[in-house]
Amino acid sequence: WHGFQHGIGLIGHAAPLAYLLKSNLVYIASSFTSKDAGKVPCASDPTIDNFVRFANCQTIHDGYEFTRQDKIRNITKYAIGQNKPIELRVCWQSSGGKNCCKCEKCYRTIMGILAEEGDPNSFGLSYKKEDSHTIKKFIKYKLKMNSVSVAYWQDIQQRFLENQDIK
């Protein structure tokens, strides 16, 4: 999926809706950054996505300059500064429209928000302080790391090191 049809598949899903809404622009959020170029085989890349056009619509591969942790930092900072909760939907495991808060992507997002001094509960992710033990066990015993997940978790780890005064 990632190496061949990721971007075009997502854009293909957006095309009928863009047509119905008479939209001339579709944004696809970046999965990786320019520093990841060539390291991770992914068919969702600005050199491909930005050239996909259909009907009167063009595609913009957005946020390529930001890591996932940078994006979490920006969202967290905005939500705290504006005193507005923002419900994120990051989970692909849950079929009910909410985050399961038990999968790798939910855990990664929870930890990323905590690293930015945010409260995951304000972002649609259920979290209690004692959940950190469950997450730690998951990372240690169940998580199968690959080149992609290692980079994401290292960014989170780096933010915790930078924000050592987090309560």
Map each language-model feature to its residues.
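Nucleotide-activated chemistry modules centered on ATP-dependent adenylation/adenylyltransferase
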Residues: W1-K167
